[in-house]
Structure formats: C-alpha cells, structure tokens
C-alpha cells in the first residue's frame, strides 16, 4: 500500500482538504507513470511563506519563499550538484522523498493565473512528485 505522510503546519490548508488533495495527486501521478502496484512512501508539508523561505534559504541558498520544494530521499540523491536524481528503481526505491508547499505563494499564484486554488495545489504537488 502506498503511503503519504502529510503534515499541516498552517491551518489555512484545511480549507481545501489538503491531505486528501495531495494524497490523490500522488496516487494518480504514480498510476500514470506505471507504478500503481508498488509500495512507495512520500512526505508532504503544508506550510506558510515564512517556513518556506527558511527551507529555500537552507537548501537552495535563496532568501525568498517559493510555491513548492521537493527533496529526493537519500538513496536517490544526485551524485553531482545540479544533476537529476537517480532514476527510480521500482524494486529498490520505496521512500521517494519530501515535498513542501507554501500557502500564501500558492494562493497568490493561483489568483494571478485565474486558476482554482485546489487545482493549482494539485498541479504543484504533481510537479513536486515528478522531481522526486
């Protein structure tokens, strides 16, 4: 059974049923990639811009918030800075990694693009999963 661990640090995420939304996006992404029968694990954080800014500074040396960040698991880390993570091995890679989404940035961007907020968050979750 695929597992999604969701941590919501900002209660505003609950307005779009964040846990169900990101879980569904993850399952559908795996299914479309042909991995529907394999066990995978992922962690998703719903945070605010302040937390995302700290994460972006810590991991990317950028002192600003962003909409989504993703980190492949240690087993799949790139060997050379800037390279893509190692290709997914369905028989070995159970833990894919972590994703974080920033509420204010996602809301601001969805408004800017005249896109439904929940749909935009789902899109960004898929984007994050594909980076793993």
Residue ranges and their predicted role:
Residues 1-122, 130:
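An acidic/histidine-cluster motif and surrounding catalytic segment
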